[in-house]
């Protein structure tokens, strides 16, 4: 039994809870959060602490999930490794390459597992696409394109979530999903990135949209398009299915609205976090629409899984919605801790994705292509 704790019980941290509780390999032993209300909510089912440092004093704890603000990740992950814990670190991994490297070095010194996620590259349809690439029946991947349109900018946010210097804005927080997907499908080793980012609303200033072009070392190319301004409804590209696999009601009007006060927004975010990421769904998750083009066919997501288009016609692959992406994350963590197989989403994989996010922002700032130096391929094949 792997005894695990969670630091930070916002939407991301809460989404870990059901995935841990249904996995027989794990025991949710503790949580850490500065909110007295959240600690009271979990009291009786787990030990509660006001902060990660207090939780790390539990010598029986084997691992921690860190879902705190991004600017805290480096110090907290290093402290967890120093305390002898395995670490699951929410994306984005850090706010700088230097901090990400510090985290990796700390994990290697401690000899402990570092897993970075959840990322939508864990999604079962994306993993199945990668398996098609590995099987080789469609030939080499040549293009991967992913598009996502949401109201991300206008959802309740902490101030740092909109501050790019602190890992905020859609390129860090949502591009980390998209670029992870592109890397997994195209072999991981991006050579360069060219991007344009946008701030459409000065009253809610942040990087709220982007177009990113990635050139891969193996000859493939990928694009990521994201807008968080609540114009085009999410479900228009996803057969009416939302990010987590539930039917997405068509909005009667734009969700864009003026932000509330900081305190009101914090309260709204805390309330939304309780149900923002459901555990089970009738369909596989959709992070927008992703289409993979190989030499002998194109693959796209469908409500049931994948459609494979070739010269011979269209075939379908059913993908189970039984297990959530976070269920799959904890399988990967369990296997890594128990020595069954190394994790794909380890520190060096996450560093490469972070480099792409930072490179996209820098490319937009200076108006030219950015060469990449920290890229890597997946360490193994996907497990379906």
What does each of the following model-derived ranges do?
Residues 113, 120-224, 229-245, 367:
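Predominantly a Rossmann-like dinucleotide-binding segment in NAD(P)-dependent oxidoreductases
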Residues 1-43:
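N-terminal Rossmann-like dinucleotide-binding module
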Residues 39, 76, 103, 129, ...:
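Aromatic/hydrophobic pocket-lining residues that form π-stacking "cages" and hydrophobic walls in ligand
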